[in-house]
Structures are given as structure tokens and as C-alpha cells.
Amino acid sequence: PVFLFAQEAAQKGVDEVINEKFGNATGWFVELIFAQIPVTDEVGIPWVVIMLLGFATFFTIYFKFINISGFSTALNVVRGKYDDLDHPEAGVLKGDLTPGADIPETIRVEGEEGEVSHFQALTAALSGTVGLGNIAGVAIAITIGGPGATLWMIIAGLLGMTSKFAECTLGVKYRDVGEDGTVFGGPMYYLKKGLSERGAAGLGKVLAILFAIFCIGGSFGGGNMFQSNQAAIIFNSTAGFTGGASGLIFGIVMAICVGFVIIGGLKRIAAVTEKVVPFMVGIYLLAALVVIGMNFTEIIPAFGKIWNGAFAPMGVAGGFVGVLVQGFRRAAFSNEAGVGSAAIAHSAVKTKYPASEGIVSLLEPFIDTVVVCTITALVIVITGNYLDAGAASGVQLTSDAFASAIPWFPYVLTGAVILFAFSTMISWSYYGLQSWLFLFGRSEKNVMTYKIVFCLFTVLGASISLGAVTDFSDAMIFAMAIPN
């Protein structure tokens, strides 16, 4: 087998052989997770996206549109208005202070234990979702579904806010706190503990293990290799580096940067993300607003194209349904609402009241999808690059849209992409680590083993061309939604 592999590699190249072998072995899993349910003769939608949107709609109605009614409260919690309620000397106050306030027994057990503030938990979770999906994914949606896909992305983002509220509230409610104050939380724990309370301990344990396995796979793939790969491609393209060891060198540098942050644990990750996330989102939005401002006469027509295209699209496969599918699909892939990953980061917050962190998590899909994705869409629609039949797709289309306004703007976008990739990687390293420790035990040896392996995958991702590996890792991330 080794000789045959070497022979094939010599003929086709190592990347191509790995891609082919891996695709043959995992294709069935990818097809299962992303199997499409036909909506019309021309258009289908992955069943996992239907599931995510279905539960998001259910939670939105069940919690009486808390995504809207709780929005101002979320802003107040993040800026620290209610921090005195979490103070250890505040005691247990009477009444339902937040929607779904915690039970006194849990409050007494938890106290104010936790590792990070509300704002740090939000930025840590945001850094895992605000990434290439906001830049490349939006471009893909508009290329296929036209400007109208933007409206359906926004609606899906608003619905996803309630899914985040539910999973992040549970993440805090059922977390474990170690003797040294380290927090262990996420779907692994609320599936195991919550279902055990309801007489389904066996089912809860199985679902928790499945989630942990999928999460580890997603952390190495979509949360790591894909990010380093795309960051390396756009950096080398912008810098003019081609061939040779450019990808390997970029991967090593990125791995060193990632390793430096993740070795310090969640507190260092949160300390980095609370500075990097506002900076990178701010830089990206500022650059986008400059492009929009330079074409301000096209703003109103652009909104007209988005509105009209959402209900009466022209030249889009599947018509109205085709546009709706593209918008919903890209929103689900971007904000990961219902996947469960964010609950791991939010579970480490310093609070007595689980629902207070659930309220904070409402902001995550709003910033990710409603704000960042919408601004990206406006840049693409206003500049009109998507109309060129021979135009690039994905991140390159967005880059071209920026370049059409100011030639050197792709350099700004390159910096934003690298920061997006970096922040996504450090957050997903934490998600994967929590799942790793859940499966293999909480020891320093297991912690270091995971972190070293994670950094090796960073180098690997930047060094090879990804195909089937990317498909599989994406499938692993969305497979997390099934047990969750």
C-alpha cells in the first residue's frame, strides 16, 4: 500500500492523491449530512439547514420573540449595567429578574464562578463565527441567488438569535466548575445532565459523545485547516508569493501565533478576542462603508434590488424559492446558530443567572449575519461585480468589489481575512479542547496533546490544497447540530 501510494503521488501529486483517497472514504458522510430535500424541480435545500431554521422558528415563537424584546437588555448586560446582580454579596434576589432566571439551588452552587466577562464570552464566540463565511459565503449567495438572497439571510439571522439564546442559557446552567475555577461547559454537558434529569441518561450520554466527536473533527477541519488554507491563499496572492514553500512558511508562522494564544487557555483567548474582534470587525466595516460612501447614489437602488430580488428574482435558478434557499443556507453556515459551538464559549462567563448569558448571545447572530453579512452584500451589489458572468466567486469576488472603489483596498481585505481566520482558529481550538477533555479526561497531558495536534493541523492546512477534506470538516460542524 505504501509503495502504491508513493507511485500515485509521483504521478498525480500528494495533494491530489490525499484528496481523492479521503473523498472516497468520507464521501458517504458528507452526502448524508448535506443531503438535499428537493423544493422545486431545480432547487433543493440541505435537510440540516431545514432542521436549524425549523427549530429557530419554533424557539422564536416559544420564547415570544425574545430576539426583539430582549435586544436592548442584551446591550445593557454586555456594557455591565447589571454586573451588581452577579456580585457574590448581592445574594439571591426575589422575582424573575431575567426571562427564565436560574433556580436558587443552581445559583448557590455556582455563585459567581466563571472565567470571563459577558463581553469576553461574546467576543470569543463571535470570533468563531465572524470569519470567511461573512466574506466568501455572502459573495457565493449573491452570485447564485442574486441580491435578493440578502433579505433572506437577514431573516434567517434574526431567527437564529433565539437558537443561540436557548443553547447558551443551557450551556451556563449545566456547566461544570473545577476546583481551580476552570469551567467545562457546552452541549456535551447539558445533553448528558439535562437528559439524565429527565430519565434519559443513556441517550444523553450517547448524544454528548457524538457531539464531542463531531466538534473535534470540526475544530481540526473547518475551524482550523480551512481557515489557515484560505488565509494563506489570499496572503500569498496579494503579496505575490507563488509556489515553493510559501504556504508552508505561512502555516508555520500562523501556527506559532495560534499556539502562543491557546497555550494560555480561555482567559488568554478571551483577552485576545476582546481586542481583536472589535478591531477586525471595525476595520472591515469601515472599509466597506468607504466603498458604499463612494457610491452613495447607488445605495437606494441597491436596497431596491435586494427587496425586489427577494420576491421577484430575474434569471435565478428556481426563482423565488432559489433565492430564499441561498439566503437561508448562507446564514446558517455563517452564524452557526443551533450548532452548539457558541454554548461552549458562553458557558465560561462569570454569572449567577444562565439566562443573562443567553440574552447576551442574542447579539452574536445579529452582528454576524444582520450587520457584517448585510454590509458585505451591499458592497457587492452596489459595485455590480456579481453581474459579470466571468467574475470570480467567493472571497475573490468580494476583493474585486473592494478594488473597484480603491485599488489598494484588497490589502485591507487581506488583513481582515487573516484576522478573521486567526480569531476563528483560536476560538475553535477551545471548542475542540473542551470536547477532547470530555472524551479523554481532564489532564494536562491531554490538554497539551490536543493543542500540539491543533497547531500541526494549522501548518498542514496552509500547505496543501483542500477539497474533500474541507467538505468533510464542514459536514462535521453541521453534524454537531443533530445531537444538539
Task: Give, region by region, the residue ranges found by the protein language model.
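N-terminal alpha-helical transmembrane segments of multi-pass membrane transport
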Residues: 1-128, 143-149, 160
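Extracellular loop-to-transmembrane helix junctions
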Residues: 41-70, 143-182, 368-375, 474-483
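Membrane-interface loop-to-helix entry segments
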Residues: 52, 59, 63-76, 207, ...
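Flexible loop linkers connecting adjacent transmembrane helices
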Residues: 66-118, 140-142, 146-150, 162-202, ...
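Membrane-embedded translocation segments of transport machinery
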Residues: 258-274, 279-347, 351-352, 364, ...
